[in-house]
Curated annotation (Swiss-Prot):
Residue stretches spanning the membrane: 1-21
Keyword flag Cell inner membrane: yes
Name listed for the protein in its UniProt record: Sec-independent protein translocase protein TatA
Subcellular location field: Cell inner membrane
Principal location: membrane
The organism of origin for this protein: Pasteurella multocida (strain Pm70)
Classification via InterPro entries: TatA/B/E, TatA/E
Keyword Iron assigned: no
GO-annotated molecular function: protein transmembrane transporter activity
Gene for this chain: tatA
GO annotation, biological process: protein transport by the Tat complex
């Protein structure tokens, strides 16, 4: 109905190849791949930083809790 058929898609791909050339498209594809790889790496690095920060905060809270328990025992 309103969708793109296979033949229309092939015609569009052929026109794009004729306009830009295969070398330019290959370069564009590799640049796009490197961009995606860099984005994924940045996301992974961000998650590692957040995990380290969370661990640091949880260690601090455990230390504070132990200190408060010790103070409560001394007061009792």
């Amino acid at each position: 109905m309103g969708g793109i058929s296979i033949t229309q898609l092939l015609i569009i791909v052929a026109i794009v190849v004729l306009l830009f050339g295969t070398k330019k498209l290959r370069t564009l594809g590799s640049d796009l791949g490197e961009s995606v790889k860099g984005f994924k790496k940045a996301m992974a690095d961000d998650n590692k930083e957040k995990d380290a920060e969370f661990k640091s905060l949880s260690d601090d809270s455990e230390t504070t809790a132990k200190t408060e328990k010790a103070k409560d025992k001394e007061q009792a």
